[in-house]
Amino acid sequence: MQATRSWQLRVPQETTNLIVDSPASIAHDDLREVTRDASSILVPVLPSSIDIHAASRCIADLLLVAKVDRRDRKLAVVANRTRKNTKSFEKLMRFLDSLGIPIIAVLRDSQNFVRAAEEGIGICEMTPYKVKKDMEQFEKIIEWLDLWRTRGYQTVDTSVIEQSPNVTMFRKPGVGSS
């Protein structure tokens, strides 16, 4: 049974944060719709040429189509699954530095994320000393998002934060996790 679009986009009234997980290439009308009321937008980027290219198009669409103003500082980037001291990491960081958009976290390519997914838990639920480095980066993301919440905004648009109380996960139909 297929749900109607309005049902899929329905947000419970008690929701304080809304996470939209979308592909990098989203139709322009949909992009405008999902970013219209966004208080913050996070773009995760992997250290690969393919992902860098997709992210550059996504960010261009956010700036030019959705009219997100980078001076508002509500748009940020997260480097995802990185390995420092590699050429791909250097290439990714050069690309991200060239954007003029804040890089708020650099998530490492860690087995902690694999284990957490296998166990169906978030890394914050794992043994603290084992995930210390990963949690330091996640805390940067959470702090950045909290900055927007304390300013009175109601929605968060991201694809990297785990589900927590008062957060509703929304995925476009047919789209898997990033």
Residue ranges and their predicted role:
Residues 23-109:
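Conserved catalytic-core segment of NTP-binding enzymes
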Residues 1-28, 32, 36, 117-121:
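P-loop/Walker-type NTP enzyme "switch/lid" segment
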Residues 19, 43, 126-130:
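Residue-level detector of alpha-helix boundaries and kinks
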Residues 74-178:
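C-terminal lobe/tail of nucleotide-utilizing enzymes
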Residues 4-8, 62, 141, 145:
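Generic hydrophobic alpha-helical segments
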Residues 1-3, 48, 86, 128:
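Intrinsic-disorder/low-complexity, polar/charged segments
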